[in-house]
Amino acid sequence: MKTLVSYDIVEDKVRRKVFEACKDYGLTNVQYSLFFGDMTHNRREELFQRLRRIIGRQEGKVLICPVCDKDLRLSKAIEVSAGMPEEAAEAAVSYPGRSRKKARAG
């Protein structure tokens, strides 16, 4: 099942270890503190236990969220880059698992 992992970790060293653990489990870094990928229930549980050991008593938060295919098809994203032409920015709405569609006004 697709899985989102989001974290907000105060300590740089701990945050880096969380980042590396997510990469070790085959997840893709899609935003600064957000990973996405395909994981079985058992692999999600293994990652959870590993992250719990990494964080220990340090200040921070981790969210591991399984996402079903139906909900993934309903997801939407907006991506605009600096210097992007206005026409491209208007078309920057994407739907994971589907081709990009132009945003509609109104």
Curated annotation (Swiss-Prot):
GO terms for biological process: defense response to virus; maintenance of CRISPR repeat elements. InterPro entries: CRISPR_associated_Cas2, Virulence_VapD/CRISPR_Cas2. It is an enzyme of class 3 (hydrolase). The keyword Ribosomal protein does not apply. CDD domains: Cas2_I_II_III. Gene3D superfamilies: 3.30.70.240. Keywords: Antiviral defense, Endonuclease, Hydrolase, Magnesium, Metal-binding, Nuclease. Its cofactor is Mg(2+). GO terms for molecular function: metal ion binding; RNA endonuclease activity. It comes from the Bacteria. Mg(2+) binds at residue 8. Residues 86-106 are annotated as: Disordered. Its EC number is 3.1.-.-. Homodimer, forms a heterotetramer with a Cas1 homodimer. Belongs to the CRISPR-associated endoribonuclease Cas2 protein family. NCBIfam families: cas2. CRISPR (clustered regularly interspaced short palindromic repeat), is an adaptive immune system that provides protection against mobile genetic elements (viruses, transposable elements and conjugative plasmids). CRISPR clusters contain sequences complementary to antecedent mobile elements and target invading nucleic acids. CRISPR clusters are transcribed and processed into CRISPR RNA (crRNA). Functions as a ssRNA-specific endoribonuclease. Involved in the integration of spacer DNA into the CRISPR cassette. HAMAP family: Cas2. This is CRISPR-associated endoribonuclease Cas2. It comes from Desulforudis audaxviator (strain MP104C). The lineage of its organism: Bacteria, Bacillati, Bacillota, Clostridia, Thermoanaerobacterales.
